[in-house]
Amino acid sequence: MYSEPPLFEFRQVGVSIDDVVRLENLSFSAFRGEFMLLHGATGSGKTLVLEMLSGLRKPTEGEVIVAGDRINDYNELERRSLRRSMGLLMQGGLLLEDRSVLENVLIPAVVAEESFREARARARIALEKCGLAALADLRPHELSAGQRQLAMLARAGVNRPALILADEPAAQLDDRNAQTLIDLLGMFAQAGVTVFLASHRIPRPRNVKVRVIELDAAARRE
């Protein structure tokens, strides 16, 4: 079905915390341009999976492969580099209140050591795609909850990552803003970005098929 190798893979992955098994025997792969949903109830281990994929947590057993590399044994510098290569839309994500919306969005591009001019131009394009171009000079506290989340999505996508990780990104939004956010994530997938979303709800982006990975009894224990 796919001519290219997976963008990332979980191979027989398990996680134990304080001698309690939280995940076990988790195996799946994701390919370029897929919109994937990691579906499960609160406490099922969705965030643990995202933490492993972004290098914030090591699996107790099994392998996590990203772009052909086994990341289990990455050192801290390699883990930071891995996270910088991804777009992260995580729970508890923050915008800096002493910076404008535009300045917040361009931060990843500046960290990637791009020229400020190029970073600024990319940030404006990202804001335009997310419908926030007119709000670029505002401070985060002047935005609605939905606008803040869209600004964080613009920041996640500003470096044109191959992979966007999203942890319950629409959990605090009303139905209209939630659908807007999901549709924008779908647009990233249409452009070839792999979107990996963890949620207890099943999103329905327009014009994009969602592949669902269920965190059920075969992959976790509570």
Stretches with model-predicted labels:
Residues G62-I71:
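Conserved ABC transporter NBD signature motif
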Residues A156-G157:
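ABC ATPase C-loop
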Residues I71-G87:
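ABC ATPase NBD coupling module
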Residues S54:
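Helix-to-loop junction immediately C-terminal to a conserved catalytic motif
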Residues I164-D167:
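Catalytic Walker B motif of ABC-type/P-loop ATPase nucleotide-binding domains
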Residues R139-L143, Q147:
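Conserved ABC ATPase signature
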Residues R160:
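Conserved catalytic motifs of ABC-family nucleotide-binding domains
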Residues R70, L106, R117-L135:
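Conserved ABC ATPase "signature" region
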